[in-house]
Amino acid sequence: MEHYRGSFDNPAMYTPLVSASLSLIAGLHGGADRRQQTHHVRHAIYRSAAAAGIAGTGFHFYNVMKRPGGCSWNNLFHAAPLGAPIALLLSGALGAVAERLRDEPAHEPQLLGMPAGRALGLLVAVGLIGTVGEAALLHFRGSFQHRAMYAPVSVPPVAAALLAHAALAVPRERWFTRLWLRITTALGFAGAAFHARGIARRQGGWHNWSQNLFAGPPLPAPPSFSALALAGLAALRLRETEK
């Protein structure tokens, strides 16, 4: 939607559409694949998505910096969103991790030379912090006009801290971390409902969807918290079984 609003001015703007679509297909295929080994095509798709996310972040940063004023609040608010390509990077990274785990033994799997639960937990914690930064920027632009707008900048940071602690500390049962990650998952769905309500309250509401989907709060943004929190729950489960 953002690139459509930008009229696909640069041919590179088609890249995330292709990459995200392929990642979605790869994810559906991987979910149905019962073979316990890495699928090299899926793995390549996920790695390409991560690379596209890195390149997209560079393009968006350039878009911000080339405007008058450079790295100013006005440009951060209204130029290409810096946090958007990172979502593609995270989805690619998590997909690649899932593929790598297929080659690991069921008992004590390893990632990047460390226990899989620790590695995945740290990755998700970093992803949560980055997503919080993007939400904080957008809600600051909206002047936090509704009290609920403070939720995505207060709940997920706690989840990230708890998950990072679980990843780095001695493995054990962590019921409070699990509970907080579930709250963060619910927060993402609740945020999508709030954003849908925000679109409905604009002039013309959903009858004027072709304009309000672009001008209103972004519908796909809040579920990113749900996706990361679910990945965090998987990491926590892995971590609790490690020695």
Feature roles, as predicted:
Residues 1-243:
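Short amphipathic, positively biased membrane-proximal segments
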